[in-house]
Amino acid sequence: MRSAAGSSAGRSCVVEAPHTRPHNHELKKEFPRHIPELAPSEAGSRKPAKCYDIPVPTFHVENFGCRATQADGAALERQFASQGLARAEKNDADFVILNTCTVTHSADQDARAAIRRLQRQNPHAKILVTGCYAQRAPEEIAALPGVTAVIGNSHKHNLAEIALREQNAPGDMVREGHDFSRAIEEQKSIAASAAEVNGSGSPQFVPLSILTPNPRNPEPGHRKPQAALYISNIFAHTELLAAPVFEGEATENSRTRPNLKVQDGCDNRCSFCIIPSVRGHSRSLPLPHVIREVNALVAAGYKELVISGINLGRWGRDLSETQNTHAGSRKANFVRLLESILERTQLEKLRISSVEPMDWTDEVIALVANSPRIARHAHVPLQSASDAVLRRMHRKYRPWHYREKIEKIHAAIPTAAIGADVMVGFPGETDAEFETTHRFIAELPFTYLHVFTYSARPGTPAAAMPNQVPVHVARERNKILRDLAAEKKHAFMQSFIGKTLDAITLGVAHDTSVAFSDNHSEPLAAASQCGESEREISLYTEALTDNYQKLYLPGTHPANRWLTLHIASIRDGAFVATPLATSEAKQ
């Protein structure tokens, strides 16, 4: 067993009373240890602490994909740490957990490439593959050399226990606590569940591959060990992994803006989306748990928190409890969640991640507009502005509904950054339908866009639709929207030149030669006005504004500080700003 490189993970120090056995809570019985007996000591005295070379198993979690996957990865790290394992670099770890994404074909490719690369770089590691790709196509992953076990999202909440079990009991079977035939039946029931949701007699959604033994076809006498599979019906899954994810550099003093997943799964059935079939029904983190997590982060000194989920606006719909407020008992829902965080914690700034348009209710918009503790930022997925395309996508809103929401948000919060997800190249998308989307976006006050090219996902209705758009056409449309997004972002940023904005420091210092690719005269002049020294003005601290814009601040500043700043210029898509004098900031 290898220990974490450059750390004390491979040693254990114990303090013993007379005639007691060595005691180490961080080690599990699955990992035998040999501790020499200690010489008897004088009666009534304590023995000094002694250190023994005890091999402590190590782990590394690598995440692929969205914020929800990152949050799952943070929860997995908690699992392994609670089992007494120590973190290590990927090429040194005993267990490497690949937490995968499957939202696009390229995401699957990235995961397979990572597995092959890891087997070359760390051939002795136990490779455990989990996440959405593992849930969707476990046997496909199990066929790759070097994979020890494939653990779907259905079993992710027990992953650390599974890892310890695999350490001593590798084998060629599905290890789910029931026989293989039952595993097949549960996997089949996923398609039945999806068909029931869609009101059809055929499985339109989620026809995941049925688990079958992986016939590696080894040469006689050279049979390779089979990867163990831990997969079951995701729609029966009720667990929700939750742990904050930190942005910024991975040091104790520079991590900022933790991200907390408070909801998982989705009950929508968009025709292009694989997510419900690999994450299951919508489920919420109970409010008391949310409040505990937020208060713990506040106590640790964090100033901003991002709350996220697969379908965040649906938070609370699955919870039976009501919330007691000054207006009486009310059913848990998204606006109640926001109100409770504001009322029951001292969090300085709450940022809301992506929320579907139908969940931007008048109540939510008013709360964001009227609370200085909620960031001026709204991300509202669009996908398409063509009514015909939205209907083929099975989206629940029409273009005029969406327009109304964006206009309301902008009217209530004029300085807010408004972003959207847009998909191009959806099956059957005509030039006219794309132009409708292009014109629609041009007319609305968007700050930024996340533009995606459609990627067919196995088992989704869209994958079987006729008139698939040629790749070169979809890529051209993608570029057109990205160019439009760049124009809108620049116009939005220009509107703040000479004004003030609040921003949180991220603690990442840049030399000007790295931060900017063109003339530095404006930033240097701004720094000189602040009295910075020659050495200091070559450094910039990265920050993020309340309305979600990157910002560079001359000099070095501690991470995790909210500052009121004067916006001086724009460089490489980021603001360059100077701090206000104390008296100005207080006004």
Regions found by a protein language model. Give the residues of each.
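Short, positively charged and aromatic/hydrophobic N-terminal segments
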Residues: 34-37, 46, 52-54, 532
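Terminal RNA-binding accessory module
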Residues: 52, 464-587
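Short polybasic linear motifs
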Residues: 26, 32, 46-49, 216-218, ...
